[in-house]
Amino acid sequence: MLKTLHVRFMAKVMKRAKCPLVLSFLYLLQVIWWCCLPQATSLSFDYDFSVPGVLAGADLRYMNDSAALQDRIELTNYSRSWSTGRVAYGKAVRLWDESTGKVASFTSNFAFAITPATSNSARGDGMAFFLGPYPPSMPTDARGGHLALINNRDNPANKDSTRTVAVEFDAFKNAGWDPDGTNCHIGVNVNDIRSAETTALPDGFFNGIMSASVRYDAQAATLSATLRLDDPPGQSPYTVSANVDLRNVGLPQEAAVGFSASIGDLVE
């Protein structure tokens, strides 16, 4: 465990046999927005939820089953299956400028741990870092493997889907859209639950303290992520990158930034 905990999000997932899996998200969160936009200033924020009272005063929005506890945030409700949750920064962030066409760059660094409650607990679906419309809202049909990101397009009732760009940390293979050959991966998602680019991870990788960095390079129009396993240390990092123009893919000028997670009713 880290001695200094800056931000901690927690979610719990369960299988049909009622064996819970606890996913402790975000020990450390830092977001820096570099703005090259007219009438815009750079933005940065971080939170240390281990300090009493910081969580209560944090400018964060909680959606659906996410909830603030004393020193952490639970993204999903472990007591029931098919739970979803989102937590987003309370203010809009400026992605691009209509008059000039310029797009902002940013970086987000965070550390998290995924810890099974028992040694034989099955893996849940995972979590994601997302960008979407502001004010943020909760998808109505994005449970299980949809990671509370994008509505299930196999449901005819879901005619439209909110524009969303994300980096997913996927801990469970869904045969309908996840890549073959691996049960765990990181991916870049652009308006679709099927990742535009993925990097496979070893089975059982999401077990221990991990550090992640998500970076958008506006000049290169590239969204990339790096994931390291900190405990135990010494393993090489895993990276994923995709070409994404945040303006051209439909994200608004004023966007929401946050994290999402969902669980299903797992059957082994």
Predicted regions and their residues:
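Polar, low-complexity loop segments and adjacent catalytic/binding residues used for recognizing
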Residues: 2-268
